[in-house]
Amino acid sequence: MPIRNIAIGRPDEATRPDALKAALAEFISTLIFVVAGSGSGMAFNKLTENGATTPSGLVAAAVAHAFGLFVAVSVGANISGGHVNPAVTFGAFIGGNITLLRGILYWIAQLLGSVVACLILKFATGGLAVPAFGLSAGVGVLNAFVFEIVMTFGLVYTVYATAIDPKNGSLGTIAPIAIGFIVGANILAGGAFSGASMNPAVAFGPAVVSWTWTNHWVYWAGPLVGGGIAGLIYEVFFINTTHEQLPTTDY
């Protein structure tokens, strides 16, 4: 079962007004999400004297990221699709749902949105450190890599099922909620181990501002592999599967 056409895109696509508007929407949505997510961790650290790594800090991070992503996806959905994540964009590309050129434009916007968000946070908080993603004690690089693959697979699979699949019908209206919920749940599951990034842009901004690059590749490779697998599986086995409704009988 072939997937939809994977396309590079026309050379002028990167300068088309609709593509530029979509990229701007991705920039704004990612900025909103990172301010809420990273900002909540900084606020919790300030209020609890660096207690963001405690169980209550984990719950606070999960709630803030779930709510923040719900809003970020909602405000961008009708303009760019509300990806807010290079792994989601990559999964959409693997499934033939976005061209390579537009995907690169989205990536640039998402990364810039994250960096600008972290710079704003650092300035607005009077120079507080923006915490970068890192592995917890006793967690190996391979462990974190697998965790990021699995969690991002769940995220991108949810995006496909609720937002990309043309058969989703009314399910599409709850897509932002479902996407926010899966991210919040994954943070509760994996936050104590890898930090549960699931999003290269979310990891990139804090890494740039704090200039912390230890094991940073994990937060790119894991999500991209997981997102790509999810996009491929959903596109091949579900979107392109023809469905014939069972006959009904009146009694």
Curated annotation (Swiss-Prot):
Protein name according to UniProt = Aquaporin TIP1-1
Membrane topology reported for the UniProt record? Multi-pass membrane protein
Q: Which organism is it from?
A: Arabidopsis thaliana
Which body tissues produce this protein? In all the vegetative organs, but not in seeds. Preferentially expressed in roots.
- GO CC annotation terms, alphabetical: central vacuole; chloroplast envelope; plant-type vacuole; plant-type vacuole membrane; protein storage vacuole
Which UniProt keywords are listed?
Acetylation, Membrane, Repeat, Transmembrane, Transmembrane helix, Transport, Vacuole
Please give one Gene Ontology molecular function term for this protein. Answer: urea transmembrane transporter activity
Gene name linked to the record = TIP1-1
Q: What happens when the gene is disrupted?
A: Plants display lesion formation or plant death, and low contents of glucose, fructose, inositol, and threonic, succinic, fumaric, and malic acids.
Location of motif NPA 2 in this chain is 199-201
Task: Look up the signal peptide feature and give its range.
Answer: none
